[in-house]
Amino acid sequence: MQQLEKQSDLASWHGRLSLTYEKKAHQTQVQQSYHQAPLNLQRPFYPEGPVCHSVMMHTAGGMVGGDRLSINVTLQPQTHALLTTTSAGKVYRSNGHGAQQTVQCQLDTNAILEWLPLGTIVFDQAQFRQTLQVELGPGAIFCGWDLTRFGRSARGERFMQGDWRSHTEIWQQGAPLWIDRQWLPGQPDIWESPHGLAGQPVVGSFLWVGQGVEPNLVQTARDLWQPTTDGAEMGVTRLPLGLVCRYRGPSSQAARQWFIQVWNLLRSTHLGRPACPPRVWPL
């Protein structure tokens, strides 16, 4: 048994990515970068001047049981970075072990991080746990989203077996600003339940945390959603220092398009610059 566990461990990926951003010559730059396969980072680009756009890559194509990914991001004072991915991540059916991803972000004074990965496809019978921990310094802002598709819908696959857990925490100077724990076991009754997926394969969350949002902008965010006839549902909630949007429905693209509109709204009103979708996005 121990020999089998050792073989499984050797066959698993333990990917790491560590990034530190600094403000230099009126521009945010990558000061330090360390990566361990299968995680990697493309060369940063600057489509909007001082903001550093960085693209993360998973060169193995997806995660299997036993894989572990660890991402650490540090933003020094006054920096502004946007991180995204080249494609949606994939979590394949479990081999008896779980896959996990841990992201830790430290934002110093007045730093801004936009965490905008393209999403995750969780295959039937997958076991996946993801954790996001963010620590905000004074005046710092975290903007991020998470989009998950349960099952390969185009093949008629649904998430009938498996286990998915997501844990997000955002703190500022010892005070919790947002804590969100989600658990979705793969079961037919959970798939159909209105308290689960309600028969819909896609769920998503958009977060803006660290700076207050006026009530009129909350209503504007709701109005940006275009009602559909496919059973999709949305919601927007104002936080003491931010805003959260939720989506449940059939379309990752529809959710992403709405999130981009909300992102553009908050960027324009709070940062004085419109949204600038990264060039790698399939828009």
UniProtKB/Swiss-Prot annotation:
Localization: Cytoplasm
Superkingdom, taxonomy of origin: Bacteria
Entry keyword Transmembrane: no
One GO cellular component term: cytoplasm
UniProt-recorded Gene Ontology molecular function terms: nickel cation binding
Family annotation (InterPro entries): UreD
Keyword Phosphoprotein: no
Keywords recorded for this protein, A-Z: Chaperone, Cytoplasm, Nickel insertion
Quaternary organization: UreD, UreF and UreG form a complex that acts as a GTP-hydrolysis-dependent molecular chaperone, activating the urease apoprotein by helping to assemble the nickel containing metallocenter of UreC. The UreE protein probably delivers the nickel.
The family this protein is said to belong to: Belongs to the UreD family.
Physiological role: Required for maturation of urease via the functional incorporation of the urease nickel metallocenter.
Protein name stated in the entry: Urease accessory protein UreD
